[in-house]
Structures are given as C-alpha cells and as structure tokens.
Amino acid sequence: QAIDELAAHGLIAMLEPFMSSRVNGKVGNDLTPDAVIKSMHISQGLGATSAFTWMKLPVVPEMDRVMDATTLPTLLLGGDPADPDEAFASWEKALALPSVRGLIVGRTMLYPPDDDVSSAVATAVSMVR
C-alpha cells in the first residue's frame, strides 16, 4: 500500500531487500547472488506499479548477473568491508552496469581504516558517473 501511495504522488520508494535468517539467535543477511536476486524478485512485486521504485542493493559477487535480474534503477550499498581497496574495486565494477545509478555509503566513508575521510570520499566520488 505504501508503494502505491508513493507512486500516486510521484514519489520514489527505495527498497532495500534482503533474505535474512536467524543463526545462533542473531539475524543475518544472506549475501549470495542467488539470495539477492530472490529478494529483488520479491520486492519488485510489491505495489501496483514499479514506476517510482528503486532498489538499494549490497555489492555481492556476480553483480552483473544480479543486475541482469532487474530493470529497476539501483543504488549500491557500501556495507562494512574489511578491505577498503577491495570494496572500492567492487563498487567501481558494479557502477559500470547500466541500471546502477550511484552509491549509498556510510561507515566506509565515515570510518576508513586509515582515518583519511577526504581520500575515501574522493575515491568514491571519482567512480560515480
């Protein structure tokens, strides 16, 4: 209902779908490509229209296959990477995919391992088209 109401007003719904489960009493997200695709397929079916619906997705292995499974515009989530250089490389590769429109990053920019926020932000900005 919320997605329909947003669309009726020409407002964007940003969906951040995950397949989650409890392991040892803690909720965890399944970040396999197949799980991300499944969560997207479920989310894409919400509402009477997807005209104003965007996805917010984690960068996972096989992002080209993941993005082939949707026509919706998508923003990439930064996640909590252990290796910033690896994260930047995976973001750059994913940003080249046609329906990826940008990044939504937080901790990676605010708390880089080397404490150089300016450099981390500059690196991310250089990737966005």
Where are the language model's segments positioned?
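Glycine-rich phosphate-binding active-site loops on the catalytic face of alpha/beta enzymes
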Residues: G79-P81, P98-D115
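Alpha/beta enzyme core
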Residues: Q1-L72, A82-G102, M127
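C-terminal helical cap(s) of enzyme catalytic domains, especially alpha/beta-barrels
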Residues: L110-R129
